[in-house]
Each structure stands twice: as C-alpha cells, then as structure tokens.
Design a protein with these regions (language model features):
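ATP-dependent adenylation/nucleotidyltransferase module used to activate substrates
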Residues: 1-112, 171, 188-199, 207-225
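Short, conserved beta-strand edge motifs with alternating hydrophobic and charged residues
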Residues: 69-71, 120, 126, 174
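A short, flexible beta-alpha/helix-coil linker loop
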Residues: 36-37, 132-134, 178
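Mid-to-C-terminal catalytic subdomains of enzymes
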Residues: 97, 101, 107-163, 205
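Peripheral terminal appendages
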Residues: 140-225
C-alpha cells in the first residue's frame, strides 16, 4: 500500500493511515510525490489532477515493480476526474471498478471488517481541490485551508460536509444548507480569517467541486468509459 504525502494531503490523513497500518500490519510505503515541483500543477489549470496523478504514479513506479492498482470506485467515473487519464496512460488498474463496487459498498466492506471509523469517514479530497481554478496552488494557502476546516468542523459536526474555498473574491465557506446561517460558524470563520489576514466573503451551501471552473461533465479512464 502506498500513501502520498504533500502539502495537499492533510496531516491528519497521514497520521490515520500510519495508525491503521501499524494496527493491522499493512505493508505501507509513505513518500512525497513531488507535484509541487511541477509548474503545470502549481498553475492550477482545470486538469490539475492530471499532473498530480502523473507525478504520483511515476513516483510509485520508481519505487516498485509490478501492477499498480488505484482505489477508484464506480462513483468516481461519473465525476470530472482528469487523473483517470494519467492512470490510463500508465496502465494503472482499477479493481474496484472492474468489480462494480461503488462508494457505499466500500463503506459496507469496511464495516464488515471492523473498520467502523473509516466506514463513516466523510469524503476528503485533496486540499488543492479547495482552490479555484487558475489561482496558483501555494503550500501556505493549503495549510490555511486545513486549519480552517479543522477548526470549524466541530461547530457543525464532523460528519457534515464543510469546505474552505479560496476564490478570486476571497474566502468562501461551504457547508450543508441547514448550517449556512449558523451564527457560531460565522463568528468562528470571521475570527479565524482575521487572525490569518484573510477576507471572508461568503458562507453558502456546499456544492461538490465548485472550485473547478470550466470543467467538462465527465472524464473516464480508458477501458472504463
């Protein structure tokens, strides 16, 4: 099993996977993938994920021989995933897709094997996904996003979708609709932004992938269209 570290990966995610690997005896490789050395990635085009996954898979290939399998599931094929193009170019296999397994089934499998906190873990796309297309990816910005989300999540509940977006207008907090008018959330977000010299411009209903501007509807991997 390979886990990538970079400024785009929340430190809590790395701690979690290390803890599980130690507990269950997984053969875990942890390494940086170097996407921040790639100017194409940092420029944050709409297909940024293509350059991220290209660096990721090339890094894994430099460390191991044999087949590389991703954790892509069938639900991922219905979303904009330029990283799947990078996977197809490198003959990465997608066993969950081949088996017709979607995200809910992955969660059910985790429950069956006693991995209950993983089964209930909210979706955690990389921190770079919070940055609006065309705004350069900066490690300091991603650390800010991580701090904001970790600080605000307890206010609305850890299972509630919450995103800190970096937009051209300023900082936007997205949260499930029932929490948009939460006064404690607004107070906390305003205070944190002021502490970090950022401008909070809006708290609005969560919209998946809203930071991607100009994205096509679907990008599927070769052999899995």
């Amino acid at each position: 099993m390979f886990h990538a570290t970079s400024p785009a990966v929340p430190p809590s995610a790395t701690l979690r996977v290390r803890r599980y690997a130690e507990l269950h005896g997984w053969n875990l490789l942890v390494a940086g993938t170097g996407e921040f050395s790639d100017a194409r990635y940092r420029a944050n085009p709409v297909d940024r994920c293509y350059f991220c996954k290209s660096n990721l898979y090339d890094r894994i290939r430099s460390m191991i021989q044999g087949t590389i399998a991703s954790g892509t599931n069938t639900d991922d094929l219905a979303d904009y995933r330029p990283g799947l193009t990078a996977a197809g170019e490198r003959a990465i296999v997608h066993p969950l897709v081949d088996a017709g397994i979607d995200k809910s089934t992955v969660r059910a499998i985790a429950r069956k094997y006693g991995l209950h906190d993983l089964a209930e873990l909210p979706a955690q796309p990389c921190l770079a996904s919070r940055v609006e297309t065309g705004i350069a990816i900066d490690a300091g910005d991603l650390a800010f996003v991580d701090r904001m989300e970790n600080s605000l999540a307890p206010i609305v509940g850890l299972q509630t979708p919450l995103r800190c977006r970096i937009t051209r207008r300023g900082i936007v907090i997205e949260v499930s609709a029932e929490h948009v008018d939460n006064s404690n959330l607004r107070e906390g977000a305003t205070r944190l932004c002021a502490e970090m010299k950022r401008s909070l411009v809006d708290i609005r209903a969560y919209e998946r992938g809203s930071a991607f501007v100009g994205k096509p509807s679907v990008v599927s991997a070769p052999d899995h269209a």
